[in-house]
Amino acid sequence: MDSTRPSRPKVSIADRFGSPPNRDNRRMPSPPKVLFGFHAVGVRLKTSPKSVFEVFFDASRRDARMRQFTDRAREAGVRLIESDGLRLAKMCGSHGHQGVVARVDEQAQVKSLDELLEQLEAAGTAQPLLLVLDGVTDPHNLGACLRVADGAGAQAVIAPKDHAADINATVAKVASGAAETVPYFMVTNLARTLNELKERNIRCIGTSDDAVKTIYDADLTGPVALVLGAEGEGMRQLTRKTCDELVSIPMRGAVESLNVSVASGVCLYEALRQRR
């Protein structure tokens, strides 16, 4: 496999939000070398076909969906290799591959959170929306959060390096392509990162079951980072203290909390509603 990586232009933009220190400790984790499933591979083919080295497909599948997929890959100039379900499962470590596995370049078009914010400022994005996850260690939950973040138009998802799931093939599969479209940044010190976001005039709004104000009473317009903890545990104490304000999601039934991906959807789409 060719190890050469395509060169990418460096962004040099005056940071009107301010320039926080310790830029080097906030890098995106490397995306997976293997993607599987129609959605994950299809999004990569659509957004960055040159980064797809080859696609392996189950030759026993002759349905319309597989034909359409392989036709799209051929049109993109991607090498297609016939395989079978068992071999594909061994390649990606999952039987949920749907007959499609791709080997892709490890690309990260936006290399740091600071670079992303600079690009948003340069593009005139007045209301950046970020999702911060504290303690979400389950890959399925992370994948679902990335998917809802993409749907709501969030510009990035942020998590602590020492207390979060990393991007892997399972995350990419559950995210249904959103792992390819939503930047995911793992930071060394989450509380410090939240403080730096606040220095950039991005309000950090955390969720807590005991907060009096509800998400529907909060002002989610303007630059906002929504901070959520894992189901049951919630945010860590320091993360909680660092937030500008805390809000709750109203619960009318017997259960006390929502799954973090569902809670993320409630909060992100309320922000989207307020920004219409």
Task: Please annotate each region the language model reported.
Residues 205-259:
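Active-site/ligand-binding-proximal alpha/beta "capping" segment
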Residues 84, 105, 134, 160-161, ...:
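Short beta->alpha connector loops at strand-helix junctions that form conserved
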Residues 91-106, 178-179, 183, 187, ...:
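Short basic, glycine-rich beta-strand/loop surfaces that mediate nucleic-acid
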Residues 74, 194-198, 272:
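Surface-exposed amphipathic alpha-helices with a cationic face
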Residues 42, 151, 166-178, 237-276:
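Structured adenosyl-cofactor binding patch, chiefly the S-adenosyl-L-methionine
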Residues 50, 57, 66, 79, ...:
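RNA substrate-binding interface of SAM-dependent RNA methyltransferases
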Residues 26-27, 43, 136-139, 143-149, ...:
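Hydrophobic, well-ordered secondary-structure scaffolds
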Residues 1-121:
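N-terminal positively charged helical leader segments and presequences
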